[in-house]
Amino acid sequence: MNKQLDLIKSSIKSIPNYPKEGIIFRDITSLTEIPEAFTATVNLIAEAFRHKGITKIIGTESRGFIFGAPVAVALGLPFILVRKPGKLPREVISQSYQLEYGEDKLEIHADAIQKGDNVLVIDDLLATGGTVEACIKLVNRLGGDVKHAAFVINLPDLGGGERLRKQGVEPFTLVDFAGH
């Protein structure tokens, strides 16, 4: 597995001072351009959750879709989209969450999760955990449960893993990068 993780990590380009000065952007689009790295990413996440009793997978807009959908296909599970406001056609419920400077909102179809669903949340990157926390609240409001969340990249210095663990959610990450 170390060869696969090395391939994944080396496939992620680091872009300094993007989107603003002092930030190092971890670009997963470079990973998706390398089929072996993309396949390894999907397979490692899928295998980590194959026997965890997951009933549905949620992907967060938009990069969570890139990894969540193929993992759902690999596991033969429904894939649920969590989107920004106004993007879903049926009845939705919304959840606000805090950003570094302001607030944002996520939505899910009101009929997407049923009572007792064991939901895995997938996103590309774990930073502060705010986006995933909003997803957890959406799932809980619909009667589902989130015990696991999966990410390609972890930025441990930003505390997202600890934030999720305090809510009883165990984060699974493939590669760590220092900083923010």
From Swiss-Prot:
InterPro entries noted in UniProt: Ade_phspho_trans, Adenine_PRTase, PRibTrfase_dom, PRTase-like
Origin: domain of life: Bacteria
GO molecular function: adenine phosphoribosyltransferase activity
PROSITE patterns to which the protein is assigned, alphabetical: PUR_PYR_PR_TRANSFER
Catalysed reaction, written as an equation: AMP + diphosphate = 5-phospho-alpha-D-ribose 1-diphosphate + adenine
Function in brief: Catalyzes a salvage reaction resulting in the formation of AMP, that is energically less costly than de novo synthesis.
PANTHER family: ADENINE PHOSPHORIBOSYLTRANSFERASE, PHOSPHORIBOSYLTRANSFERASE DOMAIN-CONTAINING PROTEIN
Subunit structure: Homodimer.
Name of the protein described by the UniProt record: Adenine phosphoribosyltransferase
Species of the source: Actinobacillus succinogenes (strain ATCC 55618 / DSM 22257 / CCUG 43843 / 130Z)
Gene name in the database record: apt
